[in-house]
């Protein structure tokens, strides 16, 4: 029983959705990331911008004048967030439709020299992994056991959302497949009808030709 509980806990931990990375961008470059998010799910984006210093051949904290323009589009290509933030920040939004959400970032400054680079550290957290449980425990005065139960309940809720999202994707795929199969069927029938009509026309044409030549 204990081994089963450990396996379940490991499985739940594996289902955390988070990614941490960094990337380089130039002054006019735009970087976008696609995150598949179930509906009614919180997404947290943490970022930090560093400016390349040619004297030290490394990256240093960027000046206050350099910020990042962040734009988020949902699966319907609607803008749900678009604004300029400082060189370091934390962005939060909640999805209202399931599907691919596109997070785009680019610099809002043209003050730095051409050829310079920015390094952007990015960490995207989705679902219950985005919840600050230390803050929750402090606000709600939860014991360690109560906090752990809260975490497990949130994980189960996130798993349910993921399952619903997978069913939604399967339904969309099935609808697309059925629509494609229907179009292929009607196109095949149309081709067959055209061939039959052409064959009938050729037969009549040949018959008229033979009758004109008095061969039949």
Curated annotation (Swiss-Prot):
Residue ranges of domain GOLD in the record: 30-126
Which stretches are Cytoplasmic in the membrane topology? 204-216
Which ranges of this chain reside in the Lumenal compartment per its record?
A: 21-182
Gene Ontology BP, a term = dorsal/ventral pattern formation
Taxonomically, which superkingdom? Eukaryota
Please give the start and end residues of each transmembrane region: 183-203
Its main localization is endoplasmic reticulum
Motif Prevents secretion from ER: where in chain: 213-216
Could you list this entry's UniProt keywords, alphabetically sorted: Coiled coil, Developmental protein, Endoplasmic reticulum, Membrane, Signal, Transmembrane, Transmembrane helix
- The signal peptide stretch is 1-20
Compartments it resides in? Endoplasmic reticulum membrane
| Coiled coil, from the record | 134-164
This chain's protein is named Transmembrane emp24 domain-containing protein eca
Q: What is the lineage of its organism?
A: Eukaryota, Metazoa, Ecdysozoa, Arthropoda, Hexapoda
């Amino acid at each position: 029983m204990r081994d089963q509980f450990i396996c379940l806990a490991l499985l739940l931990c594996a289902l955390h959705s988070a990614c941490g990375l960094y990337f380089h961008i130039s002054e006019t470059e735009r970087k976008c990331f696609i995150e598949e998010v179930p509906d009614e799910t919180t997404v947290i984006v943490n970022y930090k911008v560093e400016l390349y210093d040619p004297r030290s051949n490394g990256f240093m904290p960027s000046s206050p004048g350099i910020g990042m323009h962040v734009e988020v589009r949902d699966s319907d290509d609607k803008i749900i967030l678009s604004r300029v933030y400082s060189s370091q920040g934390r962005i939060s939004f909640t999805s209202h439709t399931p599907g691919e959400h596109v997070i785009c970032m680019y610099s809002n400054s043209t003050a730095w020299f051409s050829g310079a680079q920015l390094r952007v550290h990015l960490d995207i957290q989705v679902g219950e992994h985005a919840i600050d449980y230390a803050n929750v425990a402090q606000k709600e005065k939860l014991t360690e056991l109560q906090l752990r139960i809260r975490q497990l309940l949130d994980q189960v809720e996130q798993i349910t959302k993921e399952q619903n999202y997978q069913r939604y994707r399967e339904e969309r795929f099935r609808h697309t497949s059925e629509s494609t199969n229907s179009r292929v069927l009607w196109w095949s029938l149309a081709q067959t009808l055209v061939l039959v009509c052409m064959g009938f026309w050729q037969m009549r044409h040949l018959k008229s030709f033979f009758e004109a030549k008095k061969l039949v």
